[in-house]
Amino acid sequence: MINKLDGKIAFDSFSLTPNITLQAFKSLLKSNQIVSHEENEMAINIYLLPQKCGDKYFSIRLYFSQKNKVLTHLLISLQKNASIPSWTSWSEKDQLEVKKANDSWLSEEIGDIPPYKFSWGEITSVYSQREGSSYIAIKYY
């Protein structure tokens, strides 16, 4: 899924590359895959329906620079199924399990010991108590 050499991330229905433009990204997927699209003066934030990669589902949030409309970073997180995560079913215990699953998946996928730093960017597994979520942050340089 993650190519360590060039930073390409492949899901079953589309692939992302460092510095992909917003226009190019939108041409890759159907509009019904977008759950939300928010903009502010700094970034364009797009949240997708969970996407499949092999036998796993990932929630995906992408951030594009408002200045040049280029992908700057994304957050992905393993999901148990294709349903959209909600606060009604949220628990800290579940989020800590997601963090553990994200860590395990990264170790299998990348194989190195964190921190994961590459010429194209860096990858970090995060549990944020303030945000109430666990995710894999991929930041492109």
What are the functions of these language-model segments?
Residues 1-141:
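Short helix/turn-capping signatures at newly exposed starts of structured segments
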